[in-house]
Amino acid sequence: MERAVKENHKPSNVKIFHPMTEGAKRIPVNQPQSTQFRPPGTAVSAQRILGPSNVPQRVLAQAQKPILSSQKPTTQIPLRPATQGHQSSKPQGPNENRNPQQTSHSSTPNVEKKGSTDQGKTSAVPKEEGKKKQWCLEDFEIGRPLGKGKFGNVYLARERESKFILALKVLFKSQLEKAGVEHQLRREVEIQSHLRHPNILRLYGYFHDASRVYLILDYAPGGELFRELQKCTRFDDQRSAMYIKQLAEALLYCHSKKVIHRDIKPENLLLGSNGELKIADFGWSVHAPSSRRTTLCGTLDYLPPEMIEGRMHDETVDLWSLGVLCYEFLVGKPPFETDTHQETYRRISKVEFQYPPYVSEEARDLVSKLLKHNPNHRLPLKGVLEHPWIIKNSQLKKKDEPLPGAQ
């Protein structure tokens, strides 16, 4: 693989902060879906799957080794109908801010046009951002692997023209089809590419060739928050509150856009160059303008009672996950984690958990207000941001002092 990369891409003097190495993962609770590709926006019927055979566990992910080539996109489109193009926003130019971590929803990269645009057709970015660009692998210099997953790998990359540093996620079509998760990929692209927030990883666009799909992503040099939590065992109140505050602000933005994440967990959170938290995985997210859903998804330890019981759910599932995450930050493990799936389900349904003695009363108050069996009784996100424990512990340090986790 390395030889193929070297032959097709010139080496570059890219300063690399720290690799996003492979670590233990939780397996998401999957839903059986048809392997037939559907156009974006096509409704997918909700299904409830509940059983020990597909519940998540922390395991070592399998390494995949794609052989990258400079093959241009073909007309076999994995995510969209054949009449639509693969267009996306262009990373910033050399005279602009090249640090991906400083991108926010109020400051978007420049874009340029290559060829004609598809009038009246959707693309990977909002139309208001201006002109679009069609990408191919030859537009990038590929660096070292940043991470490995079930369906492909993530590489450090640099856009040749602008010298913009980014992450290139390479997914194999055959594996996506075999697992029946094409709908998740389409959903991730459609949702994440339209979100602009400093605590949400930017998805600039995508392209594909005969066998692979490529996602152009922000580069988060801090790596997975899960790895950082493993290294530290648990976080103190200040660091935990800072992350919960950032995540609450990002979720508040998502909910304002009618987006429910449904799979908040440390493995889906990355750390930017300044140590800021970034939501990175929207594979289980849904855009539900006015509907409630019954689909079982996400990670077992983070599932709320209404989802494991097969009841209707809405954006309040993210409030439950926020409470579970806050507990795991402070304790080092999820509150309902047990040796068996059945016992974990039972404890979630009963909201049965205990606090270690070192967890402060203010932190317990916040977690307890989020982990309510009745979704309507959970503390809303604005209440989270106004909670005394958050206000007391999430104050930013001096401007010249990096946040925890900054590389």
UniProtKB/Swiss-Prot annotation:
Compartments, record wording: Cytoplasm, Cytoskeleton, Spindle; Cytoplasm, Cytoskeleton, Microtubule organizing center, Centrosome
Start and end residues of each stretch annotated as Activation segment: 287-300
Molecular function terms, GO-annotated: ATP binding; kinesin binding; microtubule binding; protein serine kinase activity; protein serine/threonine kinase activity
Disulfide pattern: none
Reactions performed catalytically: L-seryl-[protein] + ATP = O-phospho-L-seryl-[protein] + ADP + H(+); L-threonyl-[protein] + ATP = O-phospho-L-threonyl-[protein] + ADP + H(+)
Segments of this protein annotated with the region Disordered: 1-130
This protein's UniProt keywords: ATP-binding, Cell cycle, Cell division, Cytoplasm, Cytoskeleton, Kinase, Microtubule, Mitosis, Nucleotide-binding, Phosphoprotein, Serine/threonine-protein kinase, Transferase
Protein's recorded name: Aurora kinase A-A
Organism: Xenopus laevis (African clawed frog)
Gene designation per UniProt: aurka-a
